[in-house]
Amino acid sequence: MLNFFAAAPRGYEYALSLELAELGASEIKESVAGVYFSAPLELGYRITLWSRLASRIIFVIYKGPCESPEQLYNAAYGIDWQMQFSNRSTFSIDFHGLGGFIKNTQFGALKIKDAIVDRFRDDDFSRPNVERVDADFRIDAHFRRGEITIGFNFSGPALHKRGYRSTTGEAPLKENLAANMLVRSGWQAAQVDLLDPFCGSGTILIEAAMMACDIAPGIHRERFGFDHWLPHNKKVWEELLNEARARASIGKTRCEIKFYGSDIDSRLVALAKRNAENAGVLELIDFNVCNALDVKAPAGSGYLISNPPYGERLGNVTSLLQLYYQLGDKFKADFGGWSIAILNSDVELLSALKLKADKQMKMNNGALECAFNLYTVHALNTRRVDPANIKIEGDVSDIAVPFANRIKKNFKQLEKWAKKEGIDSYRLYDADIPEYNVAIDKYLDYVVIQEYSAPSEIPEAVTKRRLTDVLISLPSAIGIDPNHIILKTRERKKGTNQYEKLAASKLELITTEYGAKFKLNLKEYLDTGLFLDHRLTRKLVGEKSKGRSVCNLFSYTGSASVHAALGGATSVTTVDMSNTYIDWAKENFALNGLNSDKYQFVQANCLQWMKRTHDRFDLIFIDPPTFSNSKRMEDSFDVQRDHLAMLTDVFKLLNPGGEIIFSNNKRKFKMEIAELEALGMSVKNIDNQTLPLDYKRNPHIHNTWLITHAG
């Protein structure tokens, strides 16, 4: 008996051990990412030819303790290598495992290489050459917990490479993963009709057809690791190949199972047909170009097994949630009596199906950990009602009905109001229903969802499910393209700057506000370039600016400065510490045709600039951050702690008869009115003038003050 190790992805071990037992192996022992077994040479060949789950078969030559570099060298040197491969063959070493004296795998590989070369020389043979990329003979070594296993790659190139695939789609599924899905779903045992509505390059269906027709998975392969192994018995191997060809011929004539595959991409369907033809099963599979939501269930019952698109693969998350929600409808309405198995790396997408899983398994797709869920559709169901059209007093569906109804109500009211107001961007929803803790802003025909951090006592699974329901409900509630929904996470942080960059991608739009135009960037930063809650404050700045010199401190993208300039200001000075936002402010001025020397842009620390400037102004707008500890600031800034000192400096810049509009977003802000009045200021809260209709549900979003000279 010979010893072997069948390597496979983690999670395959149990199914692989059953397959090996069925093929006739003995002394089967599961390990991490594989299974040890014993078999005579003929059976070792047979397993290599017929295993659908293994990644590779390793012929084990030596296994024993290894506690030092010397022990590793001696273990490799003790093998009679000239009986394994010719010195005219090239070789390579794949070393796996770390720990103890093995600090990196290259060290282990070099030790074994030295031992092999020395053994050949000591036995009076010239040394074989190392070929790292495409060696004739690949030695495989595993080091784990003080034990070394040395063997050679009996099967050669990875066994999932069956030999029938011409090229792959954008997100190919490995053949042994497809086989594992067929085994673990129960289809291999059931042997019934099979449908894959996201067939891609056809892997699941081709693997299934090969199973049903008794076609060996290795029958189309041209290379094996034992080709350059000196004890290789070509006669036995050829007999096994002939037997496999005969079984395939008989199996194809007896197969009565029907296979159905479809994909929306005609290029992929053509590729699937070529792959199926190469595998010899094209005549068994009915391939069609079709949207998965339009697929008709074949008569009777069967299995639907698929790997639909998910987050890492081909799609925007919001549109994918919509797809999965509609798939759930499709399955319930049209696939009564069917068994369904779905592979996905995103459990939130699976939850959007709104189906209860009979079984949930983990299954890796390459390095990506996935869920493999099995469902049974027990009876035909009518299609669910669109959540946006459900009345709260009616039947409550499994989707967020109150949220959908609130969104629809808000949209109807605010869309009409926005058109009258002369704006095209507004806040649609702001945690109106506490369970759905998001803010939703509409920018033209795009929507930005900001997810607030949930309280720690709420389970993460609950918050994820609620967010999923929000993303599913929103497109139909307001008639927006799911691809136009952008999701961000906003935490109420302390000790960090609010202007952190989020992503490299940009999505720029031009929005209009009371005749002013502003550039938006919906993706790159947490904020978009325009604080919608300050809309009326900016309008007020514009109304007060005619014939006056204006200064905008902590200007962000200069939107208040634009309103001041359009309002007739004699000069506008825009100050911000960020070069990015100063440049953005200049773009906003250019958008509005405002090009003049009377518009000044200053990149500076506002707190320091106020102390050193000699300029004086008639109107100053100051909207500092709640907190900042930017690298460009020597000290941190806290608006509650520092507003008195800051406003004292601002007041010194004010001309007689001038006004300061001071605003901030600290929810529990307390103005030091008495102290300011003692310094000769008149202070008036003007929140009621600056809170727009779309923020009436959140009256503490900001607080605004008008400051003038007393008397």
UniProtKB/Swiss-Prot annotation:
EC id:
2.1.1.173, 2.1.1.264
Occurrences of domain THUMP (ranges): 43-154
Leading EC class: transferase
One Pfam annotation, family name? UPF0020
- Catalytic activity from the UniProt record: guanosine(2445) in 23S rRNA + S-adenosyl-L-methionine = N(2)-methylguanosine(2445) in 23S rRNA + S-adenosyl-L-homocysteine + H(+); guanosine(2069) in 23S rRNA + S-adenosyl-L-methionine = N(2)-methylguanosine(2069) in 23S rRNA + S-adenosyl-L-homocysteine + H(+)
Q: Say yes or no: keyword Chloroplast present.
A: no
Q: Where in the cell is it found?
A: Cytoplasm
PROSITE patterns named among the record's database cross-references: THUMP (PS51165), UPF0020 (PS01261)
Its predominant location is: cytoplasm
Q: Which domain of life is it from?
A: Bacteria
What GO MF terms are annotated? 23S rRNA (guanine(2445)-N(2))-methyltransferase activity; RNA binding; rRNA (guanine-N7-)-methyltransferase activity
Q: GO terms for CC?
A: cytoplasm
Entry keywords, A to Z: Cytoplasm, Methyltransferase, RNA-binding, rRNA processing, S-adenosyl-L-methionine, Transferase
Which residues are connected by disulfide bridges in this protein? Answer: none
Q: Which family does it belong to?
A: Belongs to the methyltransferase superfamily. RlmKL family.
Q: What does this protein do?
A: Specifically methylates the guanine in position 2445 (m2G2445) and the guanine in position 2069 (m7G2069) of 23S rRNA.
Q: Which PANTHER family does this UniProt record tie to the protein? A: RIBOSOMAL RNA LARGE SUBUNIT METHYLTRANSFERASE K/L, RIBOSOMAL RNA LARGE SUBUNIT METHYLTRANSFERASE K_L
Q: What is this protein called?
A: Ribosomal RNA large subunit methyltransferase K/L
